């Protein structure tokens, strides 16, 4: 056998549903890489003969390999911060009250409109580095802090550039319908027209987005407006997803599922009809425990119903300056378990296999199987549950991305 690298003295949490063991585990395992792909994986005792003198061999010291982590929902490119709003919330103001008084998303919009691409790139690079240190190898980045053509395109260009200059893969999402800008305060339909007829065509022309998202909520866009944007995006050949049922139940998840959305995100107020719709369409349910925690919410997503109907649950950071300024995917694993009562295995699946499905890249990454991209992390842990159980100990030792070793 001729391989580019071989990993031994490891255990592997493949996260493959085809292996009955928890985490799809293979103990005392080995893994071989060739041309950026996993060429062989299995028990070490079954490892075929290969040229040990010509092949780099990496010893994992009985640690665990997992798929590279995938953060499938972030707003990572932004300027400014909203620490003052944090203080207001602790004094009793609600997220909705702050938004209705010109704070919230709009304050970040103003900062992003003033920032240039170089500033946004450097801020984004620092945040991407922080996630990468925790084993994240793929990140989704949304726009939505421009709310005008120039700034929305600027944010998406920066996100694309980050993907070109960093080992972390970046998937971009156009979220022009994130909030109603002040200049359209009294005519939100006209702003929706702008998103559909002017912003979206330019985003497509520059190939700046892999998907389109909308914030469907009483303080943002109505169900009818949301459907218009998602339908236009779908007709243009883009994937669609939705911020839905975070503060109330408008039926956005059902509508998005019928349109074939990859995911619906937040979903604290999702009901059983909505869960059924997700199950029937194969749409993922993205849980955002950081926002749930930071906003001190009490309405939990319907975890038991999602289990009952076998809806793939995704766990993501929702990293943003207002409702989840928490740039840590490992912290999200812990919060998903402690706050939302996921099992550690469900949480890890939510940042690997299911997160890949939510981004439409499940044929490439998210599980460790022969033929998949060699995209994995080595952790200094004795069981995969430690990734959710403990936090802050720096247990990610090495990362391999596209078959290339990325030194920590």
Curated annotation (Swiss-Prot):
The UniProt record gives the binding positions of Zn(2+) as 73, 75, 243, 318
Instruction: Indicate which residues the UniProt annotation says bind 4-imidazolone-5-propanoate.
Output: 82, 145, 178, 246, 323
Query: Which amino acids does the record list as binding N-formimidoyl-L-glutamate?
Result: 145, 320, 322
GO BP, one annotated term:
L-histidine catabolic process to glutamate and formate
GO MF entries: imidazolonepropionase activity; iron ion binding; zinc ion binding
EC number of this enzyme? 3.5.2.7
Naming one, the record's GO cellular component terms include: cytoplasm
CDD domains registered for this protein in UniProt: Imidazolone-5PH
Question: What does the entry list as the binding residues for Fe(3+)?
Answer: 73, 75, 243, 318
Which UniProt keywords are listed? Answer: Cytoplasm, Histidine metabolism, Hydrolase, Iron, Metal-binding, Zinc
Q: Which cofactor does it need?
A: Zn(2+); Fe(3+)
Q: Acyltransferase as a keyword?
A: no
State where the protein is found.
Answer: Cytoplasm
Catalytic activity entry:
4-imidazolone-5-propanoate + H2O = N-formimidoyl-L-glutamate
Mind telling me which SUPFAM superfamilies this protein's record contains? Composite domain of metallo-dependent hydrolases, Metallo-dependent hydrolases
Its UniProt pathway annotation is: Amino-acid degradation; L-histidine degradation into L-glutamate; N-formimidoyl-L-glutamate from L-histidine: step 3/3
Predominant subcellular localization, coarse grouping: cytoplasm
Q: How is the cofactor bound?
A: Binds 1 zinc or iron ion per subunit.
Q: What class of enzyme is it?
A: hydrolase
Functional description taken from the UniProt entry: Catalyzes the hydrolytic cleavage of the carbon-nitrogen bond in imidazolone-5-propanoate to yield N-formimidoyl-L-glutamate. It is the third step in the universal histidine degradation pathway.
Concerning its family, UniProt says:
Belongs to the metallo-dependent hydrolases superfamily. HutI family.
User: Any idea what this protein is called?
Assistant: Imidazolonepropionase
């Amino acid at each position: 056998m001729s391989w580019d690298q071989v990993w031994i003295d490891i255990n592997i949490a493949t996260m493959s549903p085809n292996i009955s063991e928890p985490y799809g585990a293979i103990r005392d395992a080995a893994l071989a890489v060739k041309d950026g792909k996993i060429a062989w994986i299995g028990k070490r005792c079954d490892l075929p003969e290969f040229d040990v003198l010509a092949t780099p061999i990496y010893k994992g010291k009985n640690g665990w390999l997992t798929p590279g982590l995938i953060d499938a929902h972030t707003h990572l490119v932004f300027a400014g911060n909203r620490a003052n709003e944090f203080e207001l919330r602790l004094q009793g103001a609600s997220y909705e009250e702050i938004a209705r008084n010109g704070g919230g998303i709009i304050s970040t919009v103003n900062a992003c409109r003033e920032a240039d691409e170089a500033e946004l790139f450097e801020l984004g690079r620092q945040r991407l580095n922080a996630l990468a240190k925790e084993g994240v190898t793929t990140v989704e980045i949304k726009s939505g802090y421009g709310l005008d053509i120039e700034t929305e395109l600027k944010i998406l260009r920066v996100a694309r550039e980050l993907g070109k200059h960093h080992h972390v893969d970046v998937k971009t999402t156009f979220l022009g319908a994130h909030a109603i800008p002040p200049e359209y305060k009294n005519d939100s339909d006209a702003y929706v027209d702008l998103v559909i007829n002017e912003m979206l065509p330019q985003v497509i022309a520059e190939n700046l987005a892999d998907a389109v998202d909308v914030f469907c909520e009483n303080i943002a866009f109505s169900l009818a407006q949301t459907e218009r944007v998602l339908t236009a995006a779908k007709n243009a050949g883009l994937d669609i997803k939705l911020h839905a049922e975070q503060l109330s139940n408008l039926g956005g998840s059902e509508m998005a599922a019928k349109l074939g959305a990859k995911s619906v995100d937040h979903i604290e107020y999702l009901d059983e009809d909505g869960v059924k719709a997700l199950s029937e369409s194969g749409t993922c349910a993205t849980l955002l425990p950081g926002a749930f925690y930071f906003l001190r919410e009490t309405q939990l997503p319907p975890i038991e119903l999602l289990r009952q109907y076998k809806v793939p649950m995704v766990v993501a950071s929702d990293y943003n300056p207002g409702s989840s300024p928490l740039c840590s995917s490992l912290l999200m694993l812990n919060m998903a378990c402690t706050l939302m009562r996921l099992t550690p295995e469900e949480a890890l699946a939510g940042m690997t296999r299911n997160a890949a499905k939510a981004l439409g890249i499940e044929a490439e990454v998210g599980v460790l199987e022969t033929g998949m991209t060699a995209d994995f992390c080595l952790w200094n842990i004795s069981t995969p549950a430690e990734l959710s159980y403990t936090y802050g100990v720096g247990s990610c030792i090495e990362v391999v991305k596209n078959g290339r070793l990325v030194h920590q």
